[in-house]
Regions:
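Glycine-rich phosphate-binding loop and adjacent beta-alpha segment
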Residues: 51-112, 150-153
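Short beta->alpha linker loops
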Residues: 4-5, 24-28, 49-50, 73, ...
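C-terminal hydrophobic helical "lid"/dimerization subdomain
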Residues: 7, 56-60, 100-153
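Adenosine-nucleotide cofactor-binding segment
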Residues: 1-57
Length: 153
């Protein structure tokens, strides 16, 4: 299950195999979670954008004794009553980097073409236009998923 506020990202998630998606601009995540999990919540919630609202959404929608993994690098302060973590006996993990093995496995996956990673590439720039690529990303209106900078032929 994938939640987002951008339809294009939800469509991309479906292309990669997500069996359920919810646009939280149009539907309450809590309502969707209750319907999807029969009121139990999710065993694992992965917060990938770093926004306080999405972290709080993970806490609210995690199952009893659920796991929350934070990979989004947030810059804003998050305030909440921590007793919900205790009452639900949640496990919260932070992850900033990957292991060398993870990079090797991902390189092998891309090389095998088992997963078409190019579906998520919105634009390709040559190295000499790398500054334009970073500007496009800095001014992203939500339509860009990933940008690829091509080095060499």
């Amino acid at each position: 299950m994938v939640a987002d506020i951008l339809d294009n990202r939800l469509e991309l998630a479906k292309e990669y195999g997500a069996t359920a998606v919810v646009n939280t601009k149009n539907q309450s995540l809590e309502d969707f979670t209750n319907e999807f999990t029969n009121g139990k919540g999710f065993d694992v919630c992965i917060e990938a954008c770093g926004a306080p609202e999405t972290f709080l959404g993970c806490i609210e929608n995690a199952a009893f004794a659920g796991n929350i993994v934070l990979i989004g690098n947030g810059k804003r302060e998050t305030s909440f009553v921590h007793s919900i973590i205790l009452k639900k006996e949640l496990n919260i993990f932070g992850s900033r980097n990957a292991l060398k093995e993870d990079f090797i496995n991902n390189i092998d996956l891309v090389a095998s073409k088992e997963c078409d990673v190019m579906k998520m590439v919105s634009r390709v720039y040559d190295m000499e236009n790398a500054l334009d690529a970073f500007k496009a990303l800095a001014n992203n209106d939500g339509t860009l998923a990933k940008i690829l900078i091509k080095i060499g032929d």
